[in-house]
Amino acid sequence: MAFNNQELFNKLKFNAFMVWNKREFSRLFSHALVHGGWLHLIVNMYVLWMFGKAVETTFSDHVFFPKTYSYGKFLYVLMYVLAVPVASLPALFKQKNNHYYNSVGASGAVSAIVFTTILLAPDLPLGIILIPIQLPAYIFGILYLAYSYFMSKKDKGNIAHDAHFVGSVFGFIFPIFLNPGLIHNFIFQITH
C-alpha cells in the first residue's frame, strides 16, 4: 500500500508541475488511488458507498435513461473515472509551474457522485456525518458549492476545494448530457 511506500505514493500523487511540464498524464488519474491517511480514505469510500449504488441503479433505469440503460454500470464507472481528471483541471492550470503543489484522493470524483444524487433526488434529506441536521439535497448542494468556492479562493490548507467544486458541477451536468429531461425533473421536484 502507498501509505507505507513513500516512493509509490510520490509516483501516484497529483503534481501539476509534473503533469504539465513532464507530461506525466497518468497522475491525472492515479492520485485518486492514494489518500492522505486512513480517515481520508474511509470518508471517501463511505460517501461513495452511500451514494454510488443509487446512482449506478438509476443509470441502469430505462425510465431515466431510455437510450443508455443497458450500459448503466458502464456509464456510472465512466462518470466516476472522468470526474477524477476533470476535478483536477483547476489545480492543473493554476499550479502548473509550482513544483510543490501536490494533491491526493478521490474527493472530486466522490463529489460528482453526490451531485448526481442531488440532481436525481433534490428533496433527499442530506447532512454531514456526525452532525444531526439535515437539509433538502438541493439546499445542501448550494451550501456545499458556496463553501467549496469560497474556500478555494482562500487557497489555504491541504484540501483541494476546487476539486470538490468542479467534481460536483461535473456530477450534476454529466447525467444531463445523457438525458436532458433530467433538468426539468430537477426543477419540478424543487418547485413542487
Segments from the language model and where they lie:
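A detector for small-residue-rich transmembrane helices and their helix-helix packing motifs
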Residues: M1-H192
